[in-house]
């Protein structure tokens, strides 16, 4: 916080009228205390949000095997546990920080990190352990559906948000019709390119065995199909 000195005084005497420009109130001797609204600088960024429709092959996560969050380290991070993730469900507002990285986790600048519900499922669907620098098994808090906003936290403070915690895009219909600002990613993904979010298209992973079988190959997996490298 910072202290700001301001002063109040009136020009024009006791008979000053508010319509008289010569009779203005000026500021004198008062101290205001305020906190900066700027978010702290983050060395971790949201890069992709996945809600893939992966067939359950006994992965044991109650149908959540296609859910994952892709983050990118923009600098070396010695302790990832200062970062966390929150899933804001159905436009109901923030639910706060729900997942924290382990204190033993670290990252190198440029690392693509995938936080998943099932490592086995993501390896089968997109060879994740080869494509990503790290694949981390997350908790049940990685629970997003295609209409849920995602919040990235640093030391308990939100530093980035995908979507809008107070909006449920499903209320506009699957895919949101012609709304260019829509961020629905049901059975699909969202991916950041040049600071802008792009989308695979609602339901584009339905009925596919791998990302390369779909009409919406996950961008980091393009050209990475195991038998075509």
Predicted feature descriptions by range:
Residues 82, 136-221:
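Conserved beta-structured recognition patch
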Residues 12-35:
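Extracellular carbohydrate recognition
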Residues 11-14, 38, 73-79, 89-93, ...:
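Acidic glycine-/aspartate-rich tracts in secreted/extracellular proteins
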Residues 38-91, 142-145:
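A structural motif detector for short, solvent-exposed N-terminal "entry" segments of globular domains
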Residues 31-43, 216, 220-229:
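Low-complexity, Pro/Thr/Ser/Gly/Ala-rich linker/spacer regions in secreted
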Residues 87-101:
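Short aromatic-acidic-glycine turn motif
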């Amino acid at each position: 916080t910072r202290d700001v000195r301001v002063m109040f005084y009136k020009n024009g005497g006791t008979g000053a009228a508010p319509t008289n420009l010569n009779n203005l109130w000026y500021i004198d001797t008062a101290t205001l205390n305020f906190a900066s609204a700027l978010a702290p600088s983050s060395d971790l960024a949201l890069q992709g949000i996945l809600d893939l429709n992966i067939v359950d092959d006994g992965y044991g996560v109650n149908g959540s095997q296609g859910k994952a969050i892709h983050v990118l380290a923009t600098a070396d991070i010695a302790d990832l546990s200062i970062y966390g993730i929150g899933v804001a469900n159905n436009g109901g507002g923030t639910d706060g920080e729900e997942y924290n990285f382990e204190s033993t986790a670290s990252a190198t600048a440029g690392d693509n990190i995938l936080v998943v519900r099932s490592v086995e499922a993501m390896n089968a669907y997109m060879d994740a352990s080869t494509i990503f620098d790290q694949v981390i098994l997350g908790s049940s808090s990685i629970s997003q559906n295609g209409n849920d906003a995602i919040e990235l936290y640093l030391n308990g403070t939100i530093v980035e948000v995908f979507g809008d915690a107070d909006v449920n895009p499903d209320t506009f219909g699957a895919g949101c019709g012609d709304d260019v600002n829509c961020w629905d990613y049901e059975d699909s993904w969202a991916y950041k390119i040049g600071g802008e979010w792009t989308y695979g298209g609602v339901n584009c992973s339905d009925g596919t065995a791998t990302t390369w079988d779909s009409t919406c190959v996950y961008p980091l997996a393009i050209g990475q199909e195991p038998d075509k490298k």
